[in-house]
């Protein structure tokens, strides 16, 4: 199966919470994208698999969209997508999340 591209998973402030279940699935089982990084400033500098399961999986957690894009580029996986990995209460992204999405669009990332 052909991948749709390389993705940054957006999960700011929620990666290791129930609201981050979408991100958990993407990190553990994604077949649609190659996951290049997870964005959650609370766990920046850690490995996503280590945060979730105590087992490193080679996916870095970073603190910002710009950092995620650069990290992906440095790993030879230039990001093509920002995938929303949070499901906030009420289903609406907060103001800072919407600003992050706008920055991702400005960086020519597809948002899913």
Where are these regions (language model features)?
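N-terminal phosphate-binding or glycine-rich loops at protein starts, especially the Walker A/P-loop
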Residues: 1-34
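Structural motif
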Residues: 10-14, 41-42, 78-81, 85-88
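Alpha-helical segments flanking ligand/cofactor-binding loops in enzyme cores
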Residues: 24, 102-103
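Short internal beta-strands
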Residues: 34-42, 111-112
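Short, charged/polar "capping" segments at the starts of alpha-helices
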Residues: 17-18, 43-49
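ADP-ribose/adenylate-binding Rossmann-like module
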Residues: 104-112
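Glycine-rich, highly charged phosphate/nucleotide-binding loops
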Residues: 52-75, 93-98
């Amino acid at each position: 199966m052909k991948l749709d591209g390389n993705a940054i998973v957006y999960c700011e402030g929620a990666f290791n919470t129930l609201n981050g279940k979408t991100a958990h699935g993407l990190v553990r089982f994604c077949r649609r994208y190659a996951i290049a990084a997870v964005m959650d400033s609370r766990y920046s500098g850690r490995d996503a698999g280590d945060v979730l399961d105590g087992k490193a999986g080679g996916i870095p957690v970073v603190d910002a969209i710009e950092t995620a894009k650069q990290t992906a580029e440095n790993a030879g996986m230039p990001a093509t997508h920002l995938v929303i990995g949070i499901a906030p209460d009420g289903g609406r992204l907060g103001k800072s999340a919407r600003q992050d999405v706008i920055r991702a669009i400005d960086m020519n990332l597809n948002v899913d």
